[in-house]
Structures are given as structure tokens and as C-alpha cells.
Amino acid sequence: MRKLLLATSFFVLALSTDIFSANKPQAGTKEQPAAIIQTTMGDLNCVLFPKAAPLGTKNFIELAKGTKDWKDPRTGQTKHGVPLYDNTTFHRIIPDFMIQGGDPSGTGAGEIGIKFKNETLSNLGFDHPGRLAYANAGPDTNGSQFFITEAAYPSLNGNYTIFGQCDDASVALVKKIAREPRGRNDKPNTPIIIKHIKIDEGTH
């Protein structure tokens, strides 16, 4: 079973500009929800992009809330009404690049029985730190695993679905997490746990 790995090439593509950036935490609304990723090292605050990535955003919200069924890769059992991300880990951390999590197996190779197509836009690229995107094992193999970048990384453009943007304080936390001691396959020596992902869709 192939692990969901990201290309680490430093080949630089032309930068694109877009309006999707966040300097500070933003409250969620029905039109643009926000995700608060609560970890054992602090909270990551990210706005989501339902217009740019409707499939990816919907999938993330439903898995976070537990309103979408998924298969536990450790047991093969179908989970119903269970938030997928609770008590999972960031299983891969790379300084100057990103942190990756969202696999219930904690290995990067877990299959949850969900795959959906890539959603990429020419004006939405990895030209900002703090991009929230799906990891994949090739085109149209998105599931639950996601990564957050700590720097602009335009060589990823067009290959991964960006569905959110984390604020500056969250990028600082990503950098801190990415520099934790790590071992084989860039796995942290001490587990960095995602305790819960809260979805803020406003009050209206």
C-alpha cells in the first residue's frame, strides 16, 4: 500500500497571486467556515475554501464532525458517527516544508475507503505559508490526510487540493511542530496528537 507522500523537489515554478491569505484568526461563517485544529502543542486556526474546493471542504468538515462514514484502517470496521480526526497524529514533519496528519493508522498508509478527485485552480497555489491541502498518492486519491505548509512551495502547484489557509500564528506553530525531534520516515519521536477539530460555521 502506497504511503501518501508529498514531492520534496525544490524546483521553482512561476509564482501566482491570489486573495486567499490570512494574517490572523478569522471567525467562520456559513459561506466560509473555519477549522480550529486542537493539538497537544496548541491550536491551528484555518479558514476553509468551499468555493475553491467544494468536495475537499465538505469531506473535511464531515470527517471532523463525524457525519460521514469511514473505514478504520486498523480494523477494517466502518465507523458511523465517529469524528475521524480525534486523537490522530501528525505522523510526518519536515522543517522548512510542512506537517502531515489525518491518518487514523498513524502510518501515512492508512486507507479509509474514501477517494475523491483533485480540485485545483490556476489562481490558487502554494505561494503563501500556511496552505491547508490534501495529501495524496497520485491524482484523484484524496481521502482524509492533509498537510499544512510552513513556507511558499510553488513546485506543489496543480498537484494537491488546497482547501484552506491557516493564520500567521498557526504557521509559527507549524514551524515549531516541524522542528520536533523525528526519526524514520520523518515521524516525530514524541506523538503530536490532534485532539479534536472544531468547525466554526458561524451562528446564522
Where in this protein do the model-derived segments appear?
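Sec-dependent N-terminal signal peptides
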Residues: 4-13
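Cyclophilin-like peptidyl-prolyl cis-trans isomerases
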Residues: 14-204
